[in-house]
Amino acid sequence: MIKLRMPAGGERYIDGKSVYKLYLMIKQHMNGKYDVIKYNWCMRVSDAAYQKRRDKYFFQKLSEKYKLKELALIFISNLVANQDAWIGDISDADALVFYREYIGRLKQIKFKFEEDIRNIYYFSKKVEVSAFKEIFEYNPKVQSSYIFKLLQSNIISFETFILLDSFLNIIDKHDEQTDNLVWNNYSIKLKAYRKILNIDSQKAKNVFIETVKSCKY
């Protein structure tokens, strides 16, 4: 249902400078300033620029411990959560626990998606919307939407939001209706994350329909 688009040769080790380039690419990608897919996971960085970095120690240590695929997942998992995450923070134990939780979430994506859909459905009953579709629609009066608030509150995951977007077009519809700064910051990250995911939108839609049906009975 969902699969990451990763750099080629993921089972190899890379040097410290290459780890820095990978980190920089993903960080700029998540901030909407670069496109790792368009440029095929390539970026030019001079040796001089890398040597000037006071934090190159962290990149070197990571290069000795993790393969390319693992590094990409570590950076993606942490930069999805925080676009401005510093390499020193990403290198600590908490960040690595976060990475392992992210891997677990991806492996159980169907279960997590169904769980989030049920939470959305029960939330819709709690707030007493006149129609279930209102949960996914932008409300100009409050400059937000229920589905966005659920994402902000960590009730649903970024993966669930993007799976829903694959057949409901939530992100683009919100973009058309608002230039709200808070939404814009999330929109940049969501669209960047969406680019590095291969999604089976029909399967996501089928799971959504079946899960909502099961909640009604």
From Swiss-Prot:
<dbReference type="InterPro" id="IPR015085">
    <property type="entry name" value="Phage_T4_Gp59_N"/>
</dbReference>
<keyword id="KW-0235">DNA replication</keyword>
<comment type="similarity">
    <text>Belongs to the Tequatrovirus DNA helicase assembly protein family.</text>
</comment>
<dbReference type="InterPro" id="IPR037082">
    <property type="entry name" value="Phage_T4_Gp59_C_sf"/>
</dbReference>
<dbReference type="GO" id="GO:0039686">
    <property type="term" value="P:bidirectional double-stranded viral DNA replication"/>
</dbReference>
<dbReference type="Pfam" id="PF08993">
    <property type="entry name" value="T4_Gp59_N"/>
</dbReference>
<keyword id="KW-1194">Viral DNA replication</keyword>
<dbReference type="InterPro" id="IPR015086">
    <property type="entry name" value="Phage_T4_Gp59_C"/>
</dbReference>
<dbReference type="Pfam" id="PF08994">
    <property type="entry name" value="T4_Gp59_C"/>
</dbReference>
<keyword id="KW-0238">DNA-binding</keyword>
<comment type="subunit">
    <text>Monomer. Homohexamer; when associated with DNA. Interacts (via C-terminus) with the DnaB-like replicative helicase (via C-terminus); this interaction brings about the rapid assembly of the helicase onto ssDNA. Interacts (via C-terminus) with the single-stranded DNA-binding protein; a ternary complex between the helicase assembly protein, the single-stranded DNA-binding protein and ssDNA is an obligatory intermediate in the helicase loading mechanism. Interacts with the viral DNA polymerase. Binds to single and double-stranded DNA.</text>
</comment>
<comment type="function">
    <text>DNA helicase loader protein that participates in viral DNA replication, recombination, and repair. At the fork, required for loading of the replicative helicase onto DNA protected by the ssDNA-binding protein. Coordinates simultaneous synthesis of leading- and lagging-strands.</text>
</comment>
<dbReference type="InterPro" id="IPR023197">
    <property type="entry name" value="Phage_T4_Gp59_dom_sf"/>
</dbReference>
<dbReference type="InterPro" id="IPR008944">
    <property type="entry name" value="Phage_T4_Gp59"/>
</dbReference>
<dbReference type="GO" id="GO:0003677">
    <property type="term" value="F:DNA binding"/>
</dbReference>
<dbReference type="GO" id="GO:0006260">
    <property type="term" value="P:DNA replication"/>
</dbReference>
<protein>
    <recommendedName>
        <fullName>DNA helicase assembly protein</fullName>
    </recommendedName>
</protein>
